[in-house]
Amino acid sequence: MFIEKFRVESPNVKYGDGEIESVYSYETTELVHEVRNGSYQWVVKPKSVQYQFKTDTRVPRLGVMLVGWGGNNGSTLTAGVIANREGISWVTKEKVQQANYFGSLTQSSSIRVGSFNGEEIYAPFKSLLPMVNPDEIVFGGWDISDMNLADAMGRAKVLDIDLQKQLRPYMESMVPLPGIYNPDFIAANQGSRANNVIKGPKKQQVQRIIDDIREFKEREKVEKVVVLWTANTERYSDLVVGLNDTMENLLAAVERDEAEISPSSLYALACIMEGVPFVNGSPQNTFVPGLIEMAIKRNSLIGGDDFKSGQTKMKSVLVDFLVGAGIKPTSIVSYNHLGNNDGMNLSAPQTFRSKEISKSNVVDDMVSSNGILYEPGEHPDHVIVIKYVPYVGDSKRAMDEYTSEIFMGGKSTIILHNTCEDSLLAAPIILDLVLLAELSTRIQLKAEGESKFHSFHPVASILSYLSKAPLVPPGTPVVNALSKQRAMLENILRACVGLAPENNMILEYK
């Protein structure tokens, strides 16, 4: 059974004027390696820590500024939100299609809230806590191309023509602000699009981004802004002592107009200085150590890296299943081809390398979790190929071969073929990232023994479910397994309304 909304009644939760307060007992374990009976033993000790959560339920008017607004992802997301807001339907060769938010965790997935008369009861994910209605988001942003959003939508060739015609009047007046352009960080083939760029030294570029955010916020009368990078994949930045290793050195490097500071890092720097959440949707190392240090010191939310949309999402499910079933993946070969601008940019070796790193690390935590299957340091062979094929456009093709060792020396091979519209997978993920980033800024918590409430760590690991290479606070384990990431996110939001984690034990029926 599906219910639209619910209210929690419990001594552990209190609904007040503009906020929800909850008390939550976090059940975890503590491991110690100690001498017992003359030898070292591992001892696991159950541990309970009481937390208090406080969530501001006043939902703000939200502005979203996209870096790369005129690209396939930015134009597709903007078009999709307008189509939903206006209730637009359009004719395809198969049917009359209604606008929807399919593919969005927050808008189109559900959570289990209990059982009633022997039937499982589910509710929308978004019913857990008050979230921004995506129909009410105000969009803006930057792009190195000055093409308006209606023409950019046509250039992307993602949405049906009938829908494009209906959306054009809404999008023709939407024109991106000039963006930061450094040809050294992206493929040379992007130069033909770069007719809308911010001139001047890096310090001046950062100030221009700050001014743009302030002017957008004032002009559109929005209470909060979230900035998200959905522009070209950049090459990796060199990590250099004295350049970007500390906050102080990074700021000094900007003053000197050092070449080895990427455009994405400049956008992130501007957002941190302005106290605006910044999410990186591409695989490059935007968050150099100096930026992370600065975000932590200023308590300004940063998240990323790289949208987890198609092939990698499947991989983080399948490898988790195989290793969890006691099957040993020994070879993973992933091949992709696509024909959109992302594919063209990735045809350059230096930008492909960023994507290769992002895709390659996705199985690491699953492999290291099973010392029965893998010796220390052992890892499956993992090869990734991406090719640019202009004819297929946004229709990305992904082929994967998983070879595993099974019982008594046997072999198992699984082959997957996945065809999808790349931007139609990415757009709802962008939506989820900005909605959850905004929501997380309204949640505060404190553990027993702490005197004051505080926000989540500014390095927003809560966004891991949506990222190929999750950014986590220093010293925090990286989790890539999709089911664990979703459970983490859902259970944190459940804790905010005093609900226990969903553990699927269903003991009442055992």
From Swiss-Prot:
Induction: By abscisic acid (ABA). It is found in: Cytoplasm, Cytosol; Nucleus. Its main location: cytoplasm. Its EC number is 5.5.1.4. NAD(+) binds at residues 70-73, 143, 180, 190, 193, 230-233, 281-282, 306, 309, 340-342, 355, 393-394, 422-423. Pathway: Polyol metabolism; myo-inositol biosynthesis; myo-inositol from D-glucose 6-phosphate: step 1/2. One of its GO terms (molecular function) is inositol-3-phosphate synthase activity. It catalyses: D-glucose 6-phosphate = 1D-myo-inositol 3-phosphate. It is an enzyme of class 5 (isomerase). Its cofactor is NAD(+). Pfam families: Inos-1-P_synth, NAD_binding_5. It comes from the Eukaryota. One of its GO terms (biological process) is phospholipid biosynthetic process. Gene3D superfamilies: NAD(P)-binding Rossmann-like Domain. The keyword Lipid biosynthesis applies. Keywords: Cytoplasm, Inositol biosynthesis, Isomerase, Lipid biosynthesis, Lipid metabolism, NAD, Nucleus, Phospholipid biosynthesis, Phospholipid metabolism. GO terms for cellular component: cytosol; nucleus. InterPro entries: Myo-inos-1-P_Synthase (IPR002587), Myo-inos-1-P_Synthase_GAPDH (IPR013021), NAD(P)-bd_dom_sf (IPR036291). Belongs to the myo-inositol 1-phosphate synthase family. Key enzyme in myo-inositol biosynthesis pathway that catalyzes the conversion of glucose 6-phosphate to 1-myo-inositol 1-phosphate in a NAD-dependent manner. This is Inositol-3-phosphate synthase. It comes from Spirodela polyrhiza. The lineage of its organism: Eukaryota, Viridiplantae, Streptophyta, Embryophyta, Tracheophyta.
